Structures are given as C-alpha cells and as structure tokens.
C-alpha cells in the first residue's frame, strides 16, 4: 500500500516595513480580499489572519501592520501588533520591496535576527526590476541576517506565489486543520466591513485625513427589504477633516459609501444598505481609552 501523506498546518507571520505589499500577498494567497490595500503606508493597523486550505495543508497567514518607529499611541499599538505576531508562529516571511531593497530594512531585520524559527526573505515587486538585479539584492540581504529561503515574487501579478506555497509546505510541521475549509479569516464580519470602508477613505482622500480616520460599525442588522442594514461611524480628529470626508454637498461621503457598499457586497455575497456618519473625536490617536473602545488595545497583545 502507498504511504498516506500527512496533513501539514501552521501559522505564518507576514512582516515588513509599511507598503511593501503584505496585504496584497495575503489576498492573493487566500484568493479573496480579507486585508485592505492602498498606496499609502500604514494601511494595516491590526493583525489580520487569512486562512489558506488545501486537502493536505492549512496555513494561517498573519498580516501585520508595517513596523516603523512609534510617534503616537496608535503607532505604538501597530508596532506591538507586529512584534506580538511573532510569539506563536511556525515561520516568518520578511517581505521587502525589490525597488527599494536595502533602504531602512536593518531595523526590521534586527528584530528577526535571533528568532529560532525559519525566516523567509520574500522579495516583492520583481515585475518592476530587471532580472539581473535580483542576485545583488539577495546578496545584500545575506549580509544582514540568516534566511532559510529567498523567494522572489510579484504579489500583484502572482509571479512566484505557487512556488512560495510549495516551499512553505516543505517547512510546515505536521498538524491538524484548525479552521473549517470555507473559512478565510479569523476576523468577525463587522471588523472586515469597517476595514472596507476605511480602505475607500484611504484611496479617496489625501494628506493627513486618511491616517486621522477610524471606522466603527455601529450595527449590522438582518434584512430591511431583503438587504443587510449596516450603520457605521467615521471618526476624524478635526472639523476640517470632517468637511473633507463629507465633501461639497456630500459628494465625498457618497463616493465613499458607494465604493464601500460594492466591496462589502462582493465580500458577503448579499445586497447591503450602508449608512455612514462622520464625527469629530479630537486627538483620538493619543487617547488609549478611545483606542480600546474601537478595537486597538495594546494590553491584549
């Protein structure tokens, strides 16, 4: 009789500086959007787990906020979220941007140097550099730390992602299936819905507005005329930011609402009625009690 293949499973942390493509990679791996993306750094604020399942393997990818030096209570929360994600994982994927390789990566590499678990160097955005540039990039990182594997990919185009999964499978321990096959994230629906709304704010606004914004889902009620009713509040720090979010004659808030509703309907697979409110909460990023009330609690990390 042939030998039955053993089931493999494990937790994998996606770590790297802001805006290197961690959320894009996780969405690519999962095959559906579970983490928001934008061109702006610090898009991800919380640890978000995406779940990839095959017949003989399950990987729980933990997408972390990009590590950077803290300037506010929210920034400190985001750094701690990244570091705490390394406590109980089986493997770390340190993601870097091929276009900016070597610039400022020493800080993150220093955090990973002493880990006693495999660390992969994932070089993203290889579609934006010449193939001849890859070897010098790899050589430069070999001098920085000890990496089990070097994996060039393009998260946006999918290049190298299948090879990444095959390599992961070689390193993961034998283990059970932790989540049902149809689960793609460990986050509740209301959290993902709030992130979808925040993503559109990041995409549509500029300057200090995107990162001065938080979103809280007040309620998700079953069905008004066959639709899911979602009420959410957008918090900003200044009156001027509120005016920008609302826009002239409500034009901006309408755009945010329409785009968010479309993303939420794609995620949930049902029609949605979305209502948005905008409130000023001055200096909320420096208010630990308020941060905790909307889901950012350093003590839980």
Swiss-Prot record:
Pfam families named in the record: KH_2, MMR_HSR1
Task of the protein: An essential GTPase that binds both GDP and GTP, with rapid nucleotide exchange. Plays a role in 16S rRNA processing and 30S ribosomal subunit biogenesis and possibly also in cell cycle regulation and energy metabolism.
Annotated residues for binding of GTP: 16-23, 63-67, 124-127
PANTHER family: GTPASE ERA, GTPASE ERA, MITOCHONDRIAL
Subunit-structure text: Monomer.
UniProt region (G4), positions on chain: 124-127
Segments of this protein annotated with the region G1: 16-23
Region annotated G3, chain positions: 63-66
Domain Era-type G, residue spans: 8-174
UniProt keyword Nucleotide-binding present: yes
Gene: era
Protein name as annotated: GTPase Era
Keywords associated with the record: Cell membrane, Cytoplasm, GTP-binding, Membrane, Nucleotide-binding, Ribosome biogenesis, RNA-binding, rRNA-binding
Subcellular location: Cytoplasm; Cell membrane
Region ranges (G2): 42-46
Region named G5: 153-155
Domain KH type-2 intervals: 197-282
Membrane topology classification: Peripheral membrane protein
NCBIfam families, per the entry: era, PRK00089.1, small_GTP
Gene Ontology cellular component annotations, sorted alphabetically: cytosol; plasma membrane
Main location: cytoplasm
CDD domains for the chain: Era, KH-II_Era
Membership in a protein family: Belongs to the TRAFAC class TrmE-Era-EngA-EngB-Septin-like GTPase superfamily. Era GTPase family.
Gene3D superfamilies (alphabetical): 3.30.300.20, P-loop containing nucleotide triphosphate hydrolases
A biological-process GO annotation: ribosomal small subunit assembly
